[in-house]
């Protein structure tokens, strides 16, 4: 049985840096602002996102928010920069957003620079974050995406998430209603799939 997130004591090692074969997932730094703005201002990258394309002011506000959140522990939102080791620069971000403390449930979100799509980078980062979440005692990790965002829901399916539903016209995106897929994976499903 997993422990509700509210009962978790702060971990001896804060999960502000994870390393995979090709990536470093780490806290943001002020000097990442230009790289963050490069992907956050790209209309194609933000096409299905509920935010963006970002202005320089939007990016500055995002950076101020994540840098402030990084100063606290435990965090309700664990947003990490995705750094590609080969480039030694930030190419995207990934986050776990605490949605339900009592039931140890979070929502995962991610974004990646367009020239790196289709290379398994988000899948690699998402697997590391999912493992971390369950090691920290989470029970359920969910993710949502616009139904037209095939790249995003393929990442969710690679993680072993199940499509739990489709919310019809649940939000407006740039003046038009969109449908949203909901995917999730439970701790025991993740453990069974990783044996």
What residues fall within each predicted segment?
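Acyl-donor (CoA/ACP) binding surface of acyl/acetyltransferases
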Residues: 1-47, 64, 79-195
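Active-site rim helix/loop that mediates acceptor-substrate recognition in acyltransferases
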Residues: 55-76
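Hydrophobic residues in alpha-helical segments
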Residues: 40, 49, 70-72
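A short gly/proline-enriched turn/hairpin at secondary-structure junctions
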Residues: 46-54
